């Protein structure tokens, strides 16, 4: 019997972010705001051209660079960044910090799951 549960799937979009924003994406990178800091991180799915000008991207506080198809790389900071800082999502407080694997301590796209879990508890 064929499983057709995907036809009844729901798609959720995060709407409760105060401290995260996907600002722009393109050329295999994304420009994101985490609290008051703006970062450039690699993203292989960002294959289009960025919407914003290169000048705008140059305002980033830091950038992660890595070898092609590698998650590990290095951060280069253009402005002073603390070791970690607080990010708010709805009623949650999250510690954000740059990791050697391009992440900043959490995955913003998973926030709909956090909200779903919170609503169940």
Give the predicted meaning of each segment.
Residues 2-21:
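Short, Gly/Pro- and small/polar-rich lid/capping loops
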Residues 8, 13, 53, 111-113:
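Serine/threonine-rich low-complexity intrinsically disordered regions
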Residues 108-121:
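Conserved alpha-helix/loop element of class I SAM-dependent methyltransferases that forms part
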Residues 18-35, 39-105:
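Non-catalytic substrate-recognition/targeting regions of SAM-dependent transferases
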